[in-house]
């Protein structure tokens, strides 16, 4: 049996990032062959990752990188199972490297990034025991591009025609805080308006009961107008100065808001409801078998 030295274990730890005992065990199984140990550990990591793939990853981080000339930016979301992992250096490093690759290669879709980062993802899953996924990315290019990050959970990129980076950042901060659904009322679909009308009628059934049709129609129009103002970025009062609408703020600076992208960690992902009492009971039962 080949002798497993401390130097061999140290080298394997540095190359894989895994624990000392796990590295020593892998070296022993590989007969002291470091390259074989790495291959075996990668294979084991893939198996672990496959087992973790069904676990819902609804926490994680949003990251943004902007070009030095403020002409382009990339925003990505990488998910983990817990917010605890999202705050750890290993996860942060994976996110940063993924963002850098997406930015440098001018990727516009997550698919090629997911493929390119799969080996690193498997290694992270094997090391942390949590499912990790690169969920989405958007690249924005334009005249003036600005961004704002609220911690690691909300990120916004704003594209302006005219204006300056500081204005773009201010508007991005507003988008992070106010969460507009559309750029302007003209972008609101008939489907969204119909849904809002349906909700209004359902919630106010008692108030409108017995009222003339024209009165009800005016009530609906009022609600739709309010909805359009609340949901449209250009119609919202600017968070730093509520006396000015965001659209007017841009115009005063000689700018036009072309588009915005807002990411929030886990939005749209259905989170699992955990019954901790049942989970503990199951673990206790397992120890008695």
From Swiss-Prot:
It comes from Pseudomonas aeruginosa (strain ATCC 15692 / DSM 22644 / CIP 104116 / JCM 14847 / LMG 12228 / 1C / PRS 101 / PAO1). This is Elongation factor Ts. It is found in: Cytoplasm. Its main location: cytoplasm. The keyword Cell cycle does not apply. One of its GO terms (cellular component) is cytoplasm. InterPro entries: EF-Ts_dimer_sf (IPR036402), Transl_elong_EFTs/EF1B (IPR001816), Transl_elong_EFTs/EF1B_dimer (IPR014039), Transl_elong_Ts_CS (IPR018101), UBA-like_sf (IPR009060). One of its GO terms (biological process) is translational elongation. Associates with the EF-Tu.GDP complex and induces the exchange of GDP to GTP. It remains bound to the aminoacyl-tRNA.EF-Tu.GTP complex up to the GTP hydrolysis stage on the ribosome. Pfam families: EF_TS. One of its GO terms (molecular function) is translation elongation factor activity. CDD domains: UBA_EF-Ts. The keyword Ribosomal protein does not apply. It comes from the Bacteria. PANTHER family: ELONGATION FACTOR TS, ELONGATION FACTOR TS, MITOCHONDRIAL. Residues 82-85 are annotated as: Involved in Mg(2+) ion dislocation from EF-Tu. SUPFAM superfamilies: Elongation factor Ts (EF-Ts), dimerisation domain (SSF54713), UBA-like (SSF46934). Keywords: Cytoplasm, Elongation factor, Protein biosynthesis.
């Amino acid at each position: 049996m080949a002798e497993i030295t401390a130097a061999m274990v140290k080298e394997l730890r540095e190359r894989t990032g895994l624990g000392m005992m796990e590295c020593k065990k892998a070296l022993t199984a590989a007969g002291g062959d470091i390259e074989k140990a790495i291959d075996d550990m990668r294979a084991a990591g893939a198996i672990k990752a496959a087992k973790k793939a069904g676990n819902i990853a609804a926490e994680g981080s949003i990251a943004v990188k902007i070009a030095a000339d403020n002409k382009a930016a990339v925003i990505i979301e990488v998910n983990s199972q817990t917010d605890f992992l999202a705050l750890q250096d290993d996860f942060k490093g994976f996110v940063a490297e993924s963002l850098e690759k997406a930015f440098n290669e001018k990727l516009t879709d997550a698919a090629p990034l997911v493929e390119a980062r799969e080996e690193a993802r498997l290694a992270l899953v094997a090391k942390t025991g949590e499912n990790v996924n690169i969920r989405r990315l958007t690249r924005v290019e334009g005249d003036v591009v600005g961004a704002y990050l609220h911690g690691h959970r909300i990120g916004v990129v704003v594209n302006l025609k005219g204006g300056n980076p500081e204005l773009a950042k201010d508007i991005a901060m507003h988008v992070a805080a106010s969460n507009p659904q559309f750029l302007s009322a003209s972008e609101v679909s008939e489907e969204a308006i119909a849904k809002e009308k349906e909700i209004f009628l359902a919630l106010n059934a008692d108030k409108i009961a017995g009222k003339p049709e024209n009165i009800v129609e005016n009530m609906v129009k009022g609600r739709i107008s309010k909805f359009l103002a609340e949901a449209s970025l250009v119609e919202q009062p600017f968070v730093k100065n509520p006396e000015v609408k965001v659209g007017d703020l841009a115009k005063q600076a000689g700018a036009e808001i072309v588009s915005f992208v807002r990411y929030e960690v886990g939005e749209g992902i259905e989170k699992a409801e955990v019954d901790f009492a049942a989970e503990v009971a199951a673990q206790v039962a397992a120890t008695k078998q």
